Design a protein with these regions (language model features):
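Solvent-exposed loop/turn segments connecting transmembrane beta-strands
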Residues: 25-39, 54-64, 96-103, 138-148
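Gram-negative (and chloroplast) outer-membrane scaffold detector with strong preference
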Residues: 42-126
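Outer-membrane beta-barrel "beta-signal"
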Residues: 66-68, 146-159
């Protein structure tokens, strides 16, 4: 377990500074598939953002995903800002059990994002990301390829 935490920390230490080079940067949490854990989000410009999530896999292992989204629509409901994005992501999971050794998922995705501010000081985004994809499951019997589906609900704080 200590090795898994060290690997996870190294992934975060390498990925975050590279992603945070441009634009606004956010950190938060994400619950979903293929990854549940700490998420980092970075805006590259007004239309394009990237994200990375690292955490623990449901099957007993570690996981990480990276992706990018392009903003295609923006609208308001009352004073609240919402926007719709399309993009893609890829995730990898390494298991520490007998049945599944590892899994890789690649997916097209869309998301609905809600930006809000608390007391005109703190900027947050809540998002729901869903999409179809393909999964590669590595077991003792070989590689199984099949349809997959990604989904996540998250909250990030921009700093």
């Amino acid at each position: 377990m200590k090795k898994a935490l060290i690997i996870l920390a190294l992934i975060v230490l390498v990925v975050v500074p590279v992603m945070a080079k441009k634009g606004a940067t956010a950190i938060g949490g994400e619950a979903g598939y293929p990854a549940t854990g700490i998420t980092f989000r970075f805006d590259m410009n007004d239309k394009l953002n990237g994200f990375a999530t690292a955490g623990f896999w449901y099957y007993g292992g570690i996981e990480a995903l990276v992706g990018a989204e392009y903003k295609v629509a923006q609208f308001k409901i009352g004073n609240e800002d919402f926007y719709v994005c399309v993009g893609g992501e890829a995730g990898a999971m390494i298991a520490f059990n007998k049945d599944v050794k590892a899994k890789v998922v690649a997916a097209a995705e869309g998301s609905l994002n809600w930006d809000f501010t608390i007391n005109n000081k703190s900027d947050f985004t809540v998002y729901l990301r869903l999409g179809p994809g393909v999964g590669f499951t590595f077991t003792d019997e070989g590689v199984k390829i099949g349809p997959d589906f990604i989904g996540a609900l998250g909250l990030v704080y921009y700093f």
